[in-house]
Amino acid sequence: MELGMFRLNIYQPGGPIGALYPVEKILYHGRSQYQEIMILVLRGFGKTLVLDGLIQSTESDEHIYHETLVHPAMTVHPNPRRVLILGGGEGATLREVLKHNTVEKAVMVDIDGEVVRVAREYLPEWHQGAFDDPRAQVVIMDGFEYIKEAARRGEDFDVIIMDLTDPFGPKIAAKLYTKEAIGLVKSVLRSDGILVTQAGCAALFPEAFEKVYGSVKSLFAHAEEYGVWVPSFMYVNSFVFASDKYRLTDLSMEEVDRRLRERGVETRFYSGLRHYTLIGLGGIRLLEGRGS
């Protein structure tokens, strides 16, 4: 990687569709056991985490993605005390979870300890000390194996957040999007728990999205799509919310804002109004007559 232009290929590294980003500085470039890791400074976006040639998050808009991933599920649940995060090596998902004063324990499991190490050193704006919060437990382990062990131990969680690399992207997280894996995830979710997973982009990658959505829908009473435009990704990032008890629309805009206030949660993007905007923006299935 040299100073100049960074080419982001939306579909895959080396793919036919992409965009050029001016690179102002290379802060880190290395390779772990699992993937290539770069921390770049991109003009207009600031610090940027790139894994295997795909942008994961940028300083300018990571809060949009992470607040959208975390807070709908955390806010709809009336008392999220135990939370499991699969992936999320930058620590920003953990940061957002810990904003809720109901949380007693948050376990973050990431297979790549090198990503976590690099994030600790180069991305303090992301984790903001979350790794060292006494409520946080960081586990460097394959998420699939962790879930199996947690099930054997009889552990359970109120909210489980899957913050993995894209289902259409690198293969590192592919097995955690399968029906078998989602079934294991549900086995450590309390009966009134909520699962949320990022799911790529339903509009650009419908086959990958439908695989994720189908796996979730087959196992939960309710599965709902929502989404948010992430400028650095150049697309609407899709998410899937699932529960046997709760739905995204269970709370009014006013109730969302009230819960955020009561829990001491401060956000830059997410709010009661945005909660419903996210549901509308993620309505690809609804527009095509395939709603949940």
UniProtKB/Swiss-Prot annotation:
Cellular compartments per GO CC: cytoplasm
GO biological process: polyamine biosynthetic process; spermidine biosynthetic process
Main location per the UniProt record: cytoplasm
UniProt cross-references to InterPro entries, sorted A to Z: PABS, PABS_CS, SAM-dependent_MTases_sf, Spermi_synthase, Spermidine_synt_N, Spermidine_synt_N_sf
Family, similarity comment: Belongs to the spermidine/spermine synthase family.
GO molecular function ontology, one term from the record: sym-norspermidine synthase activity
Keyword GTP-binding among record annotations: no
Keyword line: Cytoplasm, Polyamine biosynthesis, Transferase
Known partners and oligomeric status: Homodimer or homotetramer.
Protein name: Polyamine aminopropyltransferase 1
The reaction(s) this protein catalyses: norspermine + S-adenosyl 3-(methylsulfanyl)propylamine = caldopentamine + S-methyl-5'-thioadenosine + 2 H(+); norspermidine + S-adenosyl 3-(methylsulfanyl)propylamine = norspermine + S-methyl-5'-thioadenosine + H(+); S-adenosyl 3-(methylsulfanyl)propylamine + spermidine = thermospermine + S-methyl-5'-thioadenosine + H(+)
Binding site for S-methyl-5'-thioadenosine: 35, 110, 142-143
Gene3D superfamilies according to UniProt: Spermidine synthase, tetramerisation domain, Vaccinia Virus protein VP39
Pfam families: Spermine_synt_N, Spermine_synth
Record-linked PROSITE patterns: PABS_1 (PS01330), PABS_2 (PS51006)
Domain PABS: 1-244
Enzyme active site: 163 (proton acceptor)
Function according to Swiss-Prot or TrEMBL: Involved in the biosynthesis of polyamines which are thought to support the growth of thermophilic microorganisms under high-temperature conditions. It seems that long-chain and branched-chain of polyamines effectively stabilize DNA and RNA, respectively. Catalyzes the irreversible transfer of a propylamine group from the amino donor S-adenosylmethioninamine (decarboxy-AdoMet) to norspermidine, spermidine and norspermine to yield norspermine, thermospermine and caldopentamine, respectively.
Cell compartment(s), UniProt: Cytoplasm
